[in-house]
Regions:
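Active-site-adjacent structural elements in enzyme catalytic cores
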Residues: 1-201
Length: 201
């Protein structure tokens, strides 16, 4: 990551700030109502919706202008939370326990609870456990979220809430400002296949 220590200090402070906690609670209500939220992670800002709801996932694709064949990842609070919705190999489970939380997305076989809309109909899904206090607090409040950058597809990822595209901001019920993020998107790894799909943070 290229974020400074001061940036992280700001995020840590925001994690216990009363206003941020109130925003996190509002995010929980918004996600339960099928709406979108923007939240900071240790890499870039994420666009979140109920990852287990087809209609909510569709709203993410529409907002980003993203191809439906380009899958989204599943954001959760922990590896154990991921196991409730996936069937990873023992190797993949060990990999997740070694590297998560952190700026890595791990591709594993999904359970039926994960909708086709999230994965583009594929039988595998990327698992993301962010290493950021606000992101984890949001996930604790909401349950599994879409883990995708809060940008319009084809444009750069967003490192500050102020840099959000106006269309993304308008589509989001809650925008949680956690200061500047690290900047590089997560590395995407499929341990079972021995493949790195994207090199990132």
């Amino acid at each position: 990551m290229d974020g400074s220590g001061d940036d992280y200090a700001d995020g840590d402070a925001a994690a216990v700030d009363d206003e941020t906690l109130a925003q996190i609670r509002r995010a929980g209500t918004a996600v339960a109502d099928g709406e979108l939220v923007v939240y900071p992670t240790e890499t870039v800002y994420g666009l979140g919706a109920d990852a287990l709801s087809t209609s909510a996932v569709e709203r993410v694709f529409e907002t980003k202008g993203r191809d439906r064949d380009d899958p989204l990842s599943l954001g959760v609070t922990s590896v154990d939370a991921a196991l409730a919705h996936t069937r990873p190999t023992s190797l993949a489970t060990a990999f997740m326990r070694a590297f998560l939380p952190g700026p890595v997305t791990v591709v594993v076989e999904r359970e039926a609870s994960v909708p086709d809309a999230l994965t583009g109909g594929r039988d595998r899904v990327g698992i993301r456990v962010p290493d950021h206090p606000i992101a984890l607090a949001v996930l604790e409040e909401t349950g599994p979220l879409t883990a995708t950058s809060a940008n319009v597809s084809g444009t750069g990822s967003v490192q500050t809430a102020a840099a959000l595209d106006e269309s993304v901001r308008a589509a989001s019920a809650v925008v949680i400002d956690g200061g500047r993020t690290g900047g590089a998107e997560s590395t995407v790894v499929d341990p079972a296949a021995g493949t790195i799909h994207r090199r990132g943070a």
